[in-house]
Design a protein with these regions (language model features):
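The feature represents the first ordered module of a protein
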Residues: 4-84
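Short, compact, well-ordered microdomains
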Residues: 91-121
Length: 121
């Protein structure tokens, strides 16, 4: 009886009590890596829509305080903060065309591999 009353009230009032999708953090990884110049740190964060699985936000960062001291020591990073996709490199920011998260993360890890081999930038 109670369920029928709730359904009647919600339909009469036009309420939508269906579960709304939420943006949920699905990846939260951090790893220390060795570099030609000291130790670095990799950070990967991904937030997805719980209903569709679409990636809503991401953050990829490579930090090494011996390579770069500005921008919280972020040498390289990609994110979608402020509503647009962009790349951070040594304190400079540039807009990027977003090829999809999988392709972007491959690009990021290729760039990090090259940076790790350099003694300085």
């Amino acid at each position: 009886m109670r369920a029928a009353v709730i359904q009647t009230v919600t339909s009469v009032l036009g309420w939508d009590l269906a579960r709304k999708s939420q943006v949920v953090k699905t990846v939260d990884e951090e790893a220390e890596i060795s570099c030609l110049v000291g130790r670095g740190k990799l950070r990967e964060e991904v937030w997805q829509d719980s209903a569709s699985g679409c990636i809503e936000r991401y953050n990829l960062a490579f930090v090494n305080h011996l390579m770069y001291r500005g921008d919280n020591t972020r040498v390289l990073g990609y994110d979608v903060a402020h509503g647009y996709h962009h790349r951070h490199f040594m304190g400079e920011t540039e807009d990027i065309n977003f090829p999809g998260y999988e392709e972007l993360s491959k690009r990021f890890f290729r760039e990090v591999a090259a940076l790790r081999k350099k003694g300085s930038i």
